[in-house]
């Protein structure tokens, strides 16, 4: 089976007919070789010889060598592949420049290598490692530069505020300041009104007490103000003149009551002053009394001592 496969592979890599002997023809003046063309021709000859040796070894071993894991195997060449290899040579170099054996080898047994296999072999040898690093480094640098540019743009956008937005913000700040000032003034007014309410409540309490005292005085004199008020409520006055007279009389009575109350208050204040003076006098008298008692006790002691001296 191995020999049959080898023969089948050889038939795949052969061309249609055997090579023919070509006459040696001189190069025309237009087909002179440049240095890079001679290097390309030498490289094609080297590839052809290496391919022939590889095919011989694979035929002796009984088949193709299995490629390593991760490397794609090169596909067997066909008639089209052999033509592509021949076309890969430089056009300026004629076919008569090479020997017949090398041309037949190149056209018959040169396998076309896939791009993936060449790239993997080149990577395995370590040829593209610096190139890859050279390519990745600028990409990373470009990525970092772009990120920095985007960040700077975002910061600029966030910091920049157009005039149309700044004006309403300033207006809002001014309005807030005015509202704070108004709130402070309102708090002050509230505190003042609360103090005034306390004062008014105290005054109302005093007036109620004064009213109670007045009613008590009227009752003591034989006037029932409560009954009179109830009767006046039950029997409403028909004539406005009577009501006016009653009001005038009430006003006169109130005036008199106020005058009497003022007089009594003055008398009370005078009595209070007298009481204070009498209290002061009493305190002074008590002090003098204590001093007299102390002096009397001292005199008694002195007299007793004198009596004792006389008896001696």
Swiss-Prot record:
Keywords tagged on the record: Cell cycle, Cell division, Centromere, Chromosome, Coiled coil, Cytoplasm, Cytoskeleton, Kinetochore, Microtubule, Mitosis, Nucleus
Single annotated GO MF: microtubule plus-end binding
Record keyword Manganese present: no
Chain segments annotated as coiled-coil in the UniProt record: 169-210, 246-288
Quaternary state and interactors: Part of an astrin (SPAG5)-kinastrin (SKAP) complex containing KNSTRN, SPAG5, PLK1, DYNLL1 and SGO2. Interacts with SPAG5. Directly binds to microtubules, although at relatively low affinity. Interacts with CENPE; this interaction greatly favors microtubule-binding. Interacts with DSN1/MIS13; leading to localization to kinetochores. Interacts with MAPRE1/EB1; leading to localization to the microtubule plus ends. Interacts with PRPF19. Interacts with DYNLL1. Interacts with MAP4.
Name of this chain's protein: Small kinetochore-associated protein
Start-end of Polar residues biased regions: 75-84
Domain of life: Eukaryota
Functional summary from the UniProt entry: Essential component of the mitotic spindle required for faithful chromosome segregation and progression into anaphase. Promotes the metaphase-to-anaphase transition and is required for chromosome alignment, normal timing of sister chromatid segregation, and maintenance of spindle pole architecture. The astrin (SPAG5)-kinastrin (SKAP) complex promotes stable microtubule-kinetochore attachments.
Source species of the chain: Rattus norvegicus (Rat)
Compositionally skewed regions (Basic and acidic residues) per UniProt: 1-13, 131-143, 166-176
Subcellular locations according to the entry: Nucleus; Chromosome, Centromere, Kinetochore; Cytoplasm, Cytoskeleton, Spindle pole; Cytoplasm, Cytoskeleton, Microtubule organizing center
Swiss-Prot/TrEMBL GO biological process terms: cell division; cell migration; cellular response to epidermal growth factor stimulus; chromosome segregation; microtubule cytoskeleton organization; mitotic sister chromatid segregation; regulation of attachment of spindle microtubules to kinetochore; spindle organization
Domain text: The coiled coil regions mediate binding to kinetochores.
Region (Interaction with SPAG5): 156-312
